[in-house]
Regions:
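Cys-based phosphatases of the PTP/DUSP/CDC25 superfamily and their flanking regulatory architecture
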Residues: 1-316
Length: 316
């Protein structure tokens, strides 16, 4: 375990000397890599929550056959020969809710990692794009979103949704009432059969972390690490879709720490600066503040110390 201790000591020295802040500033030279033409097009400007946070054309997430626009970016991170794929996006607006769910459907993503509250300090950070009641599905133009279950924990909330394609969804929503005749029962059986058809239904977990102030850092290392490990546990299909308000600050920290935790689990080497550089080359400004960048290193020390103390025969 000498190597582990050396890694802890080296990282702690970086933190104590504020080398992480210097490292963060050195990343500022990464300028926008393309002109973000689609995001700046007049017809798409209202789809952006912030005027200065636009996805690159080369890494944006296209919608449908017409390659429609949403403020979202594919983030591919290479580390020790493995590739991790995510989607980083802004918190949906009222006018982009349909687009958001279309993105979820088309990418077959079964996990949405939400890193913000809807309102923070009196400001709207994210539109409530999901149904709050099991009895009141969210009906969109092409999809019906049904709340299947939810659980409120101390630092994050878990919601499970069923997405139904509209042509199937309309018939199934109408069958929620009581069956008074055999004709209705036959219709319901047909509806249930259609729901089992491949591609007609998609289940999604949304996990909303609520213990993180905007532009700040989480108040608990343990809560954040448990959140990420749960996210990994439930992830099955498609890229994890991560969003905060702008889709770069808290979202960037989440993706960076997730990659680091995966590396630690497999005893892989990792380089936080390299990870953040890769993210910024695919979505401008990932990890917004030096405090957020510094936090990534602090999480590493926290996890390494947990590993050290849980190893039989180890001593601090």
């Amino acid at each position: 375990m000498a190597t582990l201790r050396e890694l802890i000591e080296a990282t702690e020295k970086q933190i104590a000397r504020n080398e992480t802040f210097t490292e963060f500033l050195s990343l500022e030279h990464i300028k926008p890599l393309d002109d973000c033409i689609l995001g700046n097009a007049p017809q798409n400007r209202e789809k952006n929550r912030y005027r200065d946070i636009i996805p690159y054309d080369g890494t944006r997430v296209p919608l449908g056959e017409r390659q429609g626009y949403i403020n979202a970016s594919y983030i591919r991170i290479l580390n020790s020969g493995e590739e991790y794929v995510y989607i980083a996006t802004q918190g949906p607006l009222p006018g982009t809710t349909e687009d958001f769910w279309q993105m979820v459907w088309e990418n077959k993503s079964n996990v949405i990692a939400m890193m913000t509250k809807e309102i923070e300090n009196g400001l709207i950070k994210c539109h409530r794009y999901w149904p709050m009641s099991r009895n009141k599905p969210l009906e969109l133009q092409d999809y019906v979103i049904v709340l299947e279950d939810y659980q409120i924990l101390e630092t994050f909330t878990i919601r499970k949704f069923k997405m139904v394609k509209k042509d199937t969804g309309k018939r199934c929503i109408s069958s929620l009432g009581s069956d008074r005749d055999s004709g209705r029962k036959k219709k319901d059986k047909k509806c249930k059969a259609e729901l089992k058809r491949p591609g007609s239904v998609h289940f999604v977990h949304q996990i909303q972390f609520i213990n993180w102030p905007d532009h700040g850092i989480p108040t608990s290392f343990d809560a954040f690490v448990r959140y990420i490990r749960y996210m990994k546990k439930i992830h099955e299909t498609g890229p994890i879709i991560a969003h905060c308000s702008a889709g770069i600050g808290r979202t960037g920290v989440l993706l960076c720490v997730d990659v680091v935790l995966r590396a630690l689990e497999k005893d892989f080497e990792f380089n936080i600066k390299n990870i953040v550089t890769q993210m910024r080359e695919q979505r401008f400004g990932m990890i917004q503040t030096k405090e957020q960048y510094h936090f990534c290193y602090e999480v590493v020390v926290y996890v390494l110390r947990k590993i050290l103390t849980s190893t039989p025969g180890s001593t601090e």
